[in-house]
Amino acid sequence: MKKFAMVFPGQGSQTVGMLADLATEYPIVIETFKQASDALGYDLWYLVQQGPAEELNKTWQTQPALLAASVAIYRVWKEKFPQLKPEVMAGHSLGEYSALVCAGVLDFQDAIKLVELRGKLMQQAVPEGTGAMYAIIGLDNEAIINACKQAEEGEVVSAVNFNSPGQVVIAGAKAAVERAAALCKEAGAKRALPLAVSVPSHCALMKPAAEQLAVTLENIQINTPTISVLNNVDVKAETEGTEIRTALVRQLYSPVRWTETVEKMAQDGVLVLAEVGPGKVLNGLTKRIVGDLQAISVNDVASFNAVEEFLV
């Protein structure tokens, strides 16, 4: 068997109708969403299947929906391939919570309530319309970081997602982000694209949300991981509850170091990255980070049927 890692996507991978075909073949999908619905007090599966998209895209509803989707897919994997265990896991932003549930660190229902709260706190921290995020395409990290420093003028703007070489997301106060995006274009960026988000994630504007999240995290049971999980903030696999909590708090206002995460997996001998969750966002990034890594996205019946040919 090839050495493989599992990676879990973050916000932006959700779609109305996701996991519909998987649910018809694997009852564990509906069971997983029922557990999530019981924790939330509303029918999450109905929202995911029926929408509308603008409801599903509200961050405090997106986050539980994606977490439940990734955990449901992982549970199908465990049922179908009990012998295929990943070497390591990681999740992009919100996906880190999915990884921690699948590695046995967080209880699923605890995590569902936690990410709903995370979404609400993030939305409360920055009034809608006052923050922004832009994807900067085709400019090196240093030039982007410099553009953000130049654009600050007393406001918050910083590089927050190092997604792949030549794809970095910046976030902060709307005017400052727009200034930084313009400076990036001047410095030679191919494109600067505004992202359709209601919250500028992973920047200093999220510190108030992080402080409140920390209070709730103190009362959450943290177990020793059964599989290593590389965190977003330090690209490290922590095993102690205190360190895991601290990393989740810092994650809210710190950059997601995804490029380094995938590079570390490759250096450690991983040959295949299995994206466990809706969409194929991480699959696309993997190929740009380490060209010879194989990447598969597992989220429907057809992709599950192809898993073994990739790994065995």
Swiss-Prot record:
EC number: 2.3.1.39
Signal peptide annotation: none
Gene3D superfamilies (alphabetical): Malonyl-CoA ACP transacylase, ACP-binding, Malonyl-Coenzyme A Acyl Carrier Protein, domain 2
Active site: S93, H202
Protein name as it appears in the record: Malonyl CoA-acyl carrier protein transacylase
Acyltransferase recorded as keyword: yes
Keyword field: Acyltransferase, Fatty acid biosynthesis, Fatty acid metabolism, Lipid biosynthesis, Lipid metabolism, Transferase
Species whose genome carries this gene: Haemophilus influenzae (strain ATCC 51907 / DSM 11121 / KW20 / Rd)
